Swiss-Prot record:
Species in which this protein is naturally found: Aeropyrum pernix (strain ATCC 700893 / DSM 11879 / JCM 9820 / NBRC 100138 / K1)
Role, per record: Catalyzes the formation of 2-amino-5-formylamino-6-ribofuranosylamino-4(3H)-pyrimidinone ribonucleotide monophosphate and inorganic phosphate from GTP. Also has an independent pyrophosphate phosphohydrolase activity.
Annotated gene: gch3
Name of the protein this chain belongs to: GTP cyclohydrolase III
Entry's Gene Ontology BP terms: biosynthetic process
Family: Belongs to the archaeal-type GTP cyclohydrolase family.
Length: 241
């Protein structure tokens, strides 16, 4: 990838969230989980309209992969979240060749500054590279091991992939089932980067490279479909826009 390209990531923080949860009393977890789901759904739907994609990570703190989203589009996603949240919501959006660097810049800005929305202009061309990673034969594994043991296996896999991702500046998110997403650095070869993330021989990955997160995910899904349907042997297939 061209080193001049950079990925934009926004950090969304619900300020005072823990304190709010403690005010709900002991019979609160169902309330918290329901609200978290509603906020995530609203944020994801709003972001998708502008080519973005939300990673819930902690739910009280979420990431918005937002390459080529303008400040007003960020504001609309922030408003969608604030309309449901019970606490103050803030957002900071920064760029970086490595997505983890963009997150760290945004988080530091939220700690230093008081604005509701902080939007730093990107020096490079905004782009996104995303890998959609999954486990081979997960249906057969689930039939043999059951849903809980299969889930534990995928969580162990997620932890191993995330350790590698941290070292190279990528961001990972569990998507459910056997699916793991990785937002990739834009320096070097994406194939070589993803090859490091495939920590087992029974993994495959579709990789999408595009100006927006939503387009990148669509391309990654197409690439993964080619591997699953044996149109392309894989285990890595890259599609770019």
């Amino acid at each position: 990838m061209d080193a001049k390209k950079a990925v934009r990531v926004a950090v969304v923080e619900q300020v005072g969230y823990r304190e709010w949860t403690e005010e709900l009393g002991s019979d609160r977890e169902w309330i918290i989980q329901t609200l978290q789901s509603d906020i995530y759904a609203a944020a994801q739907k709003e972001a998708a309209g502008y080519g973005g994609f939300v990673l819930p990570i902690r739910y009280d703190i979420m990431l918005l992969i937002s390459s080529n989203m303008g400040v007003q589009e960020h504001a609309r996603v922030l408003d969608a979240i604030a309309g449901l949240s019970k606490v103050k919501v803030r957002m900071a959006s920064y760029c970086g060749v490595k997505p983890l660097d963009a997150v760290e810049r945004a988080w530091n800005a939220l700690r230093r500054r008081e604005e509701r929305l902080i939007y730093e202009r990107c020096e490079g061309e905004e782009y996104t590279a995303i890998a959609h990673i999954d486990l081979n034969n997960v249906t057969a594994i689930t039939r043999a091991e059951g849903p809980v043991r299969t889930y534990y296996e995928v969580m162990d896999l997620m932890a191993k992939i995330s350790k590698v991702a941290e070292k190279i500046g990528a961001i990972t998110q569990y998507l459910g089932g056997d699916n793991i997403l990785a937002v990739l650095p834009l320096n070097g070869s994406v194939k070589e980067t993803v090859d490091m993330l495939l920590v087992r021989s029974d993994l495959k990955a579709g990789i999408g490279i595009a100006p927006t997160a939503r387009a990148s995910l669509a391309l990654a899904a197409e690439a993964l479909h080619e591997i699953r349907s044996k149109i392309n042997p894989g285990p890595l297939v890259v599609k770019a826009q």
